[in-house]
């Protein structure tokens, strides 16, 4: 369940 949260934050971090 935390995997989905990390994915979202990862995407935003890489999209910066």
UniProtKB/Swiss-Prot annotation:
Which cofactors must be present for this protein to function? FAD
CC cofactor note: Binds 1 FAD per subunit.
UniProt organism field? Acinetobacter calcoaceticus
Describe what upregulates or represses it: By oxidative stress and catechol, and very weakly by heat shock.
Q: What does this protein do?
A: Serves to protect the cell against DNA damage by alkyl hydroperoxides. It can use either NADH or NADPH as electron donor for direct reduction of redox dyes or of alkyl hydroperoxides when combined with the AhpC protein.
Subunit structure comment from the entry: Homodimer.
Q: What class of enzyme is it?
A: oxidoreductase
Q: What is the similarity comment for this entry?
A: Belongs to the class-II pyridine nucleotide-disulfide oxidoreductase family.
EC number annotated for this UniProt entry: 1.8.1.-
Question: What name appears for this protein in its UniProt entry?
Answer: Alkyl hydroperoxide reductase subunit F
Sorted UniProt keywords: FAD, Flavoprotein, NAD, NADP, Oxidoreductase, Redox-active center, Stress response
Query: Which gene does this sequence derive from?
Result: ahpF
All disulfide bonds of the chain are none
Q: Transmembrane stretches, by residue range?
A: none
Domain of life here?
Answer: Bacteria
One of the record's GO molecular function terms = oxidoreductase activity
């Amino acid at each position: 369940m935390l995997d989905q949260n990390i994915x979202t934050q990862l995407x935003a971090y890489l999209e910066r």
